[in-house]
Amino acid sequence: VFQVFDKGTAYWTAEGGTHFVSGEIFKAYGQAGYERGSLGYPISDEYSTDSGRIQEFQGGVITSSTSGTYTLRYGTGIANAFREIGGVKVVGLPRTSETHSGKGVYQVFDNGTAYWTPQGGTHFVRAGIFNAYGSKGYERGFLGFPVSDEYSAGSGRAQEFEGGVIAWSAGAGTYVLRYGTGIANAYRDLGGARFLGVATTAETPSGKGVFQVFDKGTAYWSATSGSHFVRGEIFA
């Protein structure tokens, strides 16, 4: 049931109890069809976050901040990823609506950006990895869209993209490995960050080739012999 008041509307269900919806969130709720729309009934009161306000519904959330009012409907890729990663407590509130870019879409949040494609699903890119991603042109650059979430690897963190890998560690910083180059291809073929850890140096010229150090080995490349990793007791 619902009851309308001067400054909001109260909704009640046996499962969710009673919650008021008001202000900008109520306007967005109305645009979504109120309780008969995809959002269903409210299941929380409106509450504050570091950057704005949010209210949870059976089918999604509505957020309101100085960046605007946005609706995230569960059942869509970005909204589902937002919920699964920890919601507003982890990535904050949306700063933009979903924006089409090439074969996918993205949406900017306070603490990261979510990317979605039909092939790769939805993945958030955040913090140091996001900064490196931006320096290479984001999804329109050679890296393309993310194809994994960020994950722990060796001494740091890594995230995979269509065109390469970005690896980060507190001690060594952030490095981008671009597929199509000798060392990056060998790194991928051997199992990538999950097997060799993250890069701890950039590619370094040496004689007629280059080398790059990783947590669990060093890759060497030359035009005549290609790329090879040296690891373990053989490296020692």
Where is each model-derived feature located?
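Extended, compositionally biased repeat/scaffold regions that form elongated interaction surfaces
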Residues: 1-236
